[in-house]
Amino acid sequence: MATRILGIDPGLRTTGFGVVECEGSRLHYIASGTVRTDALPNGDLPGRLKIIFEGVREVAARYQPDCAAVEIVFVNVNPQSTLLLGQARGAALAALVSGDLAVAEYTALQMKKAIVGHGHARKEQVQAMVARLLSLPGEPSRDAADALGLAVCHAHAGASQAAIAAVSPLARRAHAQYRKGRSY
């Protein structure tokens, strides 16, 4: 059975989205794009958050994903930028959970490592690898590529979790302890 995953790369001006379908180890591109708020004046934060909330909710309603993957906000040098990005992320998360979607969260480093092979990849490298992994005719925009990368990262994480669940109870317990930060 195929699982449809919606990836979200939150941003106050541009929020990227990407939808992939995972069937076994095969990934299929469904859609990608952006929710843009740059038509609004800079000071209209509530208006921007409303557009993000409604845009993400509309994307989820249109593509009917089974789950979502959202990028975790990193702490920037500028605390004000971090707070604003966190609010954009909150609007996207609220839209997803209002539709009863399960949401997984990944850092940019985790996503880049899953897509490119190392966590310090440049945006252009993510764009190129996403296009290659999903057999796209061209490279998606940076924000859409990051969102697709999050969806692919979640698909890979799900496959890993299923493989772990198939092994012995001791291995499952050890993995669960490892994920909680404990080791044996």
From Swiss-Prot:
Where is the protein situated, by its record's location annotation? Answer: Cytoplasm
The active site lies at 9, 71, 143
Recite the UniProt keywords alphabetically. Cytoplasm, DNA damage, DNA recombination, DNA repair, DNA-binding, Endonuclease, Hydrolase, Magnesium, Metal-binding, Nuclease
Q: Which Pfam families match?
A: RuvC
Q: Name one GO cellular component term.
A: cytoplasm
Q: Where does Mg(2+) 2 bind?
A: 71
Q: What does the record note about the cofactor?
A: Binds 2 Mg(2+) ion per subunit.
Cytoplasm found in the keyword field = yes
- One GO term (biological process): DNA recombination
The record's catalysed reaction(s) read:
Endonucleolytic cleavage at a junction such as a reciprocal single-stranded crossover between two homologous DNA duplexes (Holliday junction)
- Signal peptide range equals none
Top-level taxon: Bacteria
Which residues does the annotation say bind Mg(2+) 1? 9, 143
Keyword Hydrolase attributed? yes
Cofactor(s) listed: Mg(2+)
Family assignment from sequence similarity? Belongs to the RuvC family.
**In UniProt terms, what function does this protein have?**
The RuvA-RuvB-RuvC complex processes Holliday junction (HJ) DNA during genetic recombination and DNA repair. Endonuclease that resolves HJ intermediates. Cleaves cruciform DNA by making single-stranded nicks across the HJ at symmetrical positions within the homologous arms, yielding a 5'-phosphate and a 3'-hydroxyl group; requires a central core of homology in the junction. The consensus cleavage sequence is 5'-(A/T)TT(C/G)-3'. Cleavage occurs on the 3'-side of the TT dinucleotide at the point of strand exchange.
The protein here is known as Crossover junction endodeoxyribonuclease RuvC
Q: Give the species this sequence originates from.
A: Methylibium petroleiphilum (strain ATCC BAA-1232 / LMG 22953 / PM1)
Lineage runs:
Bacteria, Pseudomonadati, Pseudomonadota, Betaproteobacteria, Burkholderiales
